[in-house]
């Protein structure tokens, strides 16, 4: 396969997964208040685990940009938007470091990559919560405790949802994770 066809296929895959993440993010996902289950992370995690670090980083960036330009972002300031809608979704690409290039597919790298990526994403949301969202803290809660509670619970719920979906994908569709040139 020629290099240009490979690049077109890769770019198409990145664009598709970023668009899918954006579309999924339009589905209401609130558990309580600001606590969410962000299943929209799953396409970017899958992209990262299938195509590697760079593809995942770019996919996350496109997803974040789509959220901002379509008005589906809670933006308080440029620095908050940068942290929560560019850095945080881009960080999901770190799962690409756990990419498996050959079969048989092992579950442990998929789960570890997912855990690390979701942890990193919600770390950035935690920092943003302390800096930008502290005025919304529950009565008697400090900024750190509030942000840790909201983002910690959201991160755990998101990781669990991603684990469940990706375990099903690994068991039923393992070829999704192994890229081939065909």
Swiss-Prot record:
It comes from the Bacteria. InterPro entries: Thia_Transptr_ThiT. Keywords: Cell membrane, Membrane, Transmembrane, Transmembrane helix, Transport. It is a multi-pass membrane protein. It is found in: Cell membrane. One of its GO terms (cellular component) is plasma membrane. One of its GO terms (molecular function) is thiamine transmembrane transporter activity. The keyword Chloroplast does not apply. In E.coli forms a stable energy-coupling factor (ECF) transporter complex composed of 2 membrane-embedded substrate-binding protein (S component), 2 ATP-binding proteins (A and A' components) and 2 transmembrane proteins (T component), probably with a stoichiometry of 2:1:1:2. May be able to interact with more than 1 S component at a time. Belongs to the vitamin uptake transporter (VUT/ECF) (TC 2.A.88) family. Thiamine transporter subfamily. Probably a thiamine-binding protein that interacts with the energy-coupling factor (ECF) ABC-transporter complex. Unlike classic ABC transporters this ECF transporter provides the energy necessary to transport a number of different substrates. The substrates themselves are bound by transmembrane, not extracytoplasmic soluble proteins. This is Thiamine transporter ThiT. The gene is thiT.
